[in-house]
From Swiss-Prot:
Gene name linked to the record: dpo3
Protein name from the UniProt record: DNA polymerase 3
InterPro entries: DNA-dir_DNA_pol_B, DNA-dir_DNA_pol_B_exonuc, DNA-dir_DNA_pol_B_multi_dom, DNA/RNA_pol_sf, DNA_pol_B_thumb, DNA_pol_palm_dom_sf, DNA_pol_type-B, RNaseH-like_sf
SUPFAM superfamilies, alphabetized: DNA/RNA polymerases (SSF56672), Ribonuclease H-like (SSF53098)
Regions annotated as coiled coil: none
Record flagged with keyword Lyase: no
Organism: Saccharolobus solfataricus (strain ATCC 35092 / DSM 1617 / JCM 11322 / P2) (Sulfolobus solfataricus)
Record keywords: DNA replication, DNA-binding, DNA-directed DNA polymerase, Nucleotidyltransferase, Transferase
Keyword Lyase included in the entry's annotation: no
Enzyme class label: transferase
Recorded family membership: Belongs to the DNA polymerase type-B family.
C-alpha cells in the first residue's frame, strides 16, 4: 500500500546483527505510527594514495566490512577517488575507523562520526516535521505502542505539508527536600502536574498516597494519553534525571515510550530521549533564544505574554510550605499553573521551532539542546551531502578556546542614553559570504589570478563555482514563507559565530580572518555613514549597532540608504527608551513595552548570592527608569545597612553551584567543593549533577574553609556579613563605576543614608 507519514523522530536498534531504522511518525489518517526499514547499512569514506588493491586488502584484514566500493566524491570542492566502506552495524564503524587510521597511504577518513539515524535522514533527505510518501506493508508487532506499524518497501517522495494535530502535554513536578541538595534516594516527589488539551491532571502526596504511586499514575497517564510531544521546563532540577533515578530507587521503570521496554535514556545530544515521542526541555530552546536574557519560567511567560503562575518558589522552599498542611494547596496550585504555562509556552514555541526543525533536520528534542553552531553545522552537512562533498570528522580540542576572540570594531561610549535605535546588521555576514564566495571548498592557498582577496591578509577564494557556505545561504534565501523568516534570520546571524568556532568540522583560521576583514570593512563603512548623517553611534558589536540622536524617520531614511548601497537587510531590531552601556558586551535597555533586556547577566552572576543578584537587577532597573545614579547609590547603601542590622533571611545569602563532575576532580580551594564535602561528611548525598548551596561563615581561615552547606547554618550570627557586604560593593561598583561613582563614595555611609532608611521604613 501507499501511505503518507509525518515524521517526528528517528531511532534504531540491532536485531540479529541487523540494524532496524524506526521512523516514528503520524500517518495520513492521524494514527501514531512506526515505519521500519531493515535494509539500510552504515558506511563511511576514506581517501587514499598508492595501490588501490593493496589498500582494499589491508582494510579487509583490519575491518569487518560488508562491502568496499570505489566512488567519486568531492573533497574541498575537488573531485577525488574514495572508498565507501559499508559495515554491518553502526558500532563497527568506530572500530574500523580506528584500525584504518593506522594504515599507510590513508589520506583521510570522512563521514565516520555521522550518527546512523542522521545518515539515514541525510541519504533519503527526510527531515522531521515534513511528510514522506512510501510503499509500505502494515504488520502486527507486539513490541510497539503505536496504533500502526509498517515495513518500508520504498520511499517514493518527500514534501512539506501541514502539521497534523499533535498531542502535546506539559509536565511539572515538585520535590520535598529539607536540605540543600536533592537526593532521589530519599526526597519524594510530592506533586506531579500535567496539562494537555483535555485540561489539568495532578497527583499528589496529599491524597494519602506515596510517591511510588504518583510515579505509577504518571506512567499510566502518559501511556493512556499517548502524547506525541512532552514539554518540560527546568534547567536546574533536570526533571527526567530526577524522575528516573527516583523511580529506580523505588524499583520502578519509567517505560513510557512507544517502543515497549525502552526506558527514558540519555540521548546523543545529552537530552533525555523517549522512544517515539519528542521529549522537549523548553529551557534548552530559550537558552539559545537571542532575544531573551533569562530563562526563568515566570519571567519568560511574562515576556511572551503567557499568563504565568501566581506564585514563585525556589525549589528548596517547597518543603517548608509542604510541612504546613494549610499551605499545601498553594504548592498544588503552583505546580498545576506551572504545567499550564509549560503547555502553553511549548505550543507557542512549537509554531516557530517547527520551521527550524525542517530547515536543520534535527528532531525537536535534539534541536532544543543543540547550540546555534551545531544547528548550522547540521544544515551544512545536509548541503554538503547533496553535492557529494565528504564530511570531515569533528576534532574537538578541549585545550583551546571554542571561539577565537574578535576585535572590537569601535570603543563603546559608556553612559546612560535615551531614545536608542538598535540596528540589526547580521545581514552583513551573509553578504560577505555570498559576495566573496568564502568557504572551505573555495579557499585557494596557491597563486590565483581570478580570485577574491581579503583586504589585509590577502587570503584568496575562487569566484566560481559557489562554495558550500554560499550554496547553503542561497537555499535559505529562496525560502519566502513568513513563518520561517525569524528562524532563518537566527541561522544567518549565527554564521558569524560558526566561522569562528574552532571545533567546527570546517573551521579554518584563514576563513575566520578573511571573514572578519571583509565584514569589518563593511561595518566601518556603515558606522561612518551613520556618523556623517549626524547620528551618534554609542555601541557596536558583531550583530548590532546602537544609534541615538535622531528621529525614527531619519533612522529609517538612513537604513534605506545603507541597504541600497550594499544590498543589505539592515533594520531596526528594537527601540530602547533608555539604555545603560558599560562596555562592548555589557548593556541593559528599557524597551517601549517596559521590558528590560540585560546582556551578559548570566555569566557574571554565576558565583553570587541571591541578594547580590537581586540588588544588581534593581540598580539596573532604577537607572533605566529614573536615570538617576544617586537613587541607585542609595539602593546599595540601604541594602548594606539592612544587612549589617541583620535584616535578611539566610536564604538570600546562598550561593548556588552545580557539580558537573566528580568531586575528586575539582580543585579543593573552591568554596562549593568544600561545602559539598562537608555535606557528605554530615550524611547527605552529593554527587555529579547535584546543586549545592553554601554560605560563608565567620572565622580566620581561608575563604573555602569557611564555606558551609546552607542547611547546616541556622543562626544569622554565624554568617560573615562583611564578606557579603564586600560582594555587594564589588559587584554593584562594576555597574556604577563606569558612570562616575568611585569606591569611596559608594562605601561611605552618613547620617542622611541612615535617616533615609528609617524614613523608608516608616512609610512602609
Amino acid at each position: 500500500m501507499i501511505k503518507d507519514f509525518f515524521i517526528l523522530d528517528f531511532s534504531y536498534e540491532i536485531k540479529g546483527n541487523t540494524p532496524l531504522v524506526y521512523i516514528w511518525s503520524v500517518d495520513d489518517e492521524g494514527n501514531s505510527s512506526v515505519v521500519i526499514d531493515n535494509n539500510f547499512r552504515p558506511y563511511f569514506y576514506i581517501i587514499y594514495e598508492g595501490n588501490e588493491n593493496e589498500i582494499i586488502e589491508n582494510i579487509k584484514k583490519n575491518c569487518e566490512a560488508l562491502q568496499i566500493t570505489k566512488v567519486k566524491r568531492k573533497y574541498l570542492g575537488n573531485i577525488v577517488d574514495a572508498l565507501l566502506i559499508q559495515t554491518s552495524t553502526p558500532t563497527q564503524i568506530k572500530k574500523c575507523r580506528e584500525k584504518i587510521s593506522e594504515l599507510n597511504n590513508i589520506k583521510g577518513i570522512f563521514d565516520a562520526d555521522i550518527r546512523y539515524t542522521m545518515r539515514y535522514s541525510l541519504d533519503f533527505d527526510l527531515r522531521p516535521f515534513t511528510w514522506f510518501r512510501a510503499e509500505v506493508n502494515e504488520v502486527k508487532f507486539d513490541g510497539f505502542r503505536t496504533k500502526k506499524a509498517y515495513i518500508l518497501d520504498k520511499i517514493l517522495s518527500h514534501y512539506e505539508g501541514n502539521m497534523p494535530e499533535l498531542r502535546t502535554i506539559g509536565v511539572d513536578f515538585q520535590i520535598y527536600s529539607k536540605y540543600g541538595s536533592l537526593n532521589p534516594r530519599k526526597d519524594p516527589i510530592v506533586v506531579m502536574s500535567l496539562w494537555s488539551k483535555e485540561g489539568p491532571m495532578q497527583f499528589s502526596l496529599d491524597e494519602g498516597i506515596d510517591d511510588l504511586k504518583i510515579i505509577r499514575r504518571f506512567v499510566d497517564y502518559i501511556l493512556n494519553y499517548d502524547p506525541d510531544i512532552i514539554f518540560v521546563y527546568d534547567s536546574d532540577l533536570l526533571p527526567w534525571k530526577y524522575i528516573t533515578e527516583r523511580a529506580s530507587s523505588l524499583g520502578v521503570k519509567i517505560d513510557i515510550g512507544r517502543k515497549i521496554g525502552s526506558e527514558v535514556s540519555v540521548g546523543t545530544y545529552g537530552h533525555y530521549s523517549i522512544s517515539g515521542r519528542l521529549n522537549v526541555d523548553l529551557t534548552g530552546l530559550l537558552v539559545n533564544e537571542r532575544s531573551l536574557g533569562h530563562v526563568d519560567l515566570i519571567d519568560v511567560s511574562n515576556y511572551l505574554g503567557i499568563s504565568p503562575s501566581r506564585y514563585s518558589f525556589k525549589w528548596y522552599e517547597i518543603s517548608r510550605y509542604w510541612d504546613n498542611e494549610k499551605n499545601r494547596r498553594i504548592i498544588r496550585e503552583y505546580s498545576i499553573e506551572n504545567a499550564r504555562s509549560i503547555y502553553l509556552l511549548g505550543n507557542y514555541l512549537l509554531s516557530t521551532y517547527s520551521e527550524l526543525v525542517k530547515i536543520v533536520g534535527l528532531p525537536l528534542d535534539k534541536l532544543s539542546v543543540a547550540s546555534w553552531g551545531n544547528r548550522i553545522e547540521t544544515s551544512l552537512i545536509r548541503t554538503a551531502t547533496k553535492s557529494g562533498e565528504l564530511i570531515p570528522i569533528r576534532m574537538d580540542n578541549p585545550n583551546r578556546p571554542s571561539k577565537i576572540k574578535k576585535n572590537i570594531i569601535i570603543q563603546p561610549k559608556v553612559g546612560i542614553y535615551t531614545d536608542v535605535y538598535v540596528l540589526d546588521i547580521s545581514s552583513v555576514y551573509s553578504l560577505v559570504i555570498r559576495k566573496f564566495n568564502i568557504a572551505p571548498d573555495t579557499l585557494v592557498k596557491e597563486q590565483c589570478d581570478d580570485c577574491y582577496s581579503s583586504p589585509i591578509s590577502n587570503y584568496k577564494f575562487k569566484r566560481e563555482p559557489s562554495g558550500l557556505y554560499k550554496t547553503f545561504l542561497d537555499e535559505l534565501s529562496n525560502v519566502r514563507d513568513s513563518n520561517k523568516i525569524k528562524v532563518i534570520e537566527e541561522l544567518i546571524s549565527s554564521f558569524n559565530d560558526y566561522v569562528h568556532w574552532v571545533n567546527a568540522r570546517w573551521y579554518s583560521r584563514e576563513i575566520a580572518s578573511a571573514f572578519d576583514e571583509f565584514s569589518n570593512e563593511i561595518i566601518r563603512f556603515i558606522i561612518d555613514l551613520i556618523k556623517s548623517s549626524g547620528l551618534d553611534v554609542i555601541l557596536a558589536n558583531d550583530l548590532l549597532i546602537f544609534v541615538t540622536g535622531g528621529s525614527r524617520d531619519k533612522v529609517n531614511e538612513l537604513i534605506t540608504k545603507i541597504n541600497s548601497l550594499y544590498n543589505l537587510d539592515v533594520k531596526v531590531k528594537i527601540f530602547y527608551k533608555s539604555l545603560l552601556v558599560l562596555d562592548n558586551n555589557r548593556y541593559a535597555g528599557l524597551s517601549e513595552g517596559d521590558k528590560i533586556d540585560i546582556a551578559r547577566k548570566g555569566e557574571e552572576d554565576m558565583n553570587l548570592c541571591e541578594l547580590a543578584r537581586n540588588i544588581k537587577r534593581k540598580i539596573i532597573e532604577e537607572i533605566l527608569i529614573s536615570k538617576d545614579v544617586k537613587k541607585a547609590i542609595k539602593l546599595v547603601k540601604s541594602t548594606v545597612i539592612k544587612l549589617r542590622r541583620g535584616e535578611f533571611d539566610n536564604e538570600e545569602l546562598i550561593t548556588w553551584a552545580k557539580i558537573e563532575r566528580d568531586l575528586n576532580e575539582y580543585n579543593n580551594q573552591l568554596p562549593f567543593v568544600t561545602a559539598a564535602r562537608k555535606a557528605i561528611q554530615s550524611g547527605y548525598l552529593i554527587s555529579k549533577d547535584s546543586k549545592i548551596g553554601y554560605v560563608i561563615v565567620k572565622g580566620l581561615g581561608p575563604l573555602n574553609d569557611r564555606a558551609e552547606p546552607f542547611f547546616l547554618v541556622k543562626e544569622k550570627n554565624r554568617i560573615d556579613i562583611e564578606y557579603y557586604v564586600d560582594q555587594i560593593f564589588r559587584e554593584t561598583l562594576k555597574l556604577l563605576k563606569p558612570l562616575g561613582v568611585n569606591e569611596e563614595s559608594l562605601k561611605k555611609t552618613n547620617i542622611t543614608d541612615i535617616l533615609d532608611l528609617f524614613g523608608a521604613s516608616k512609610k512602609k
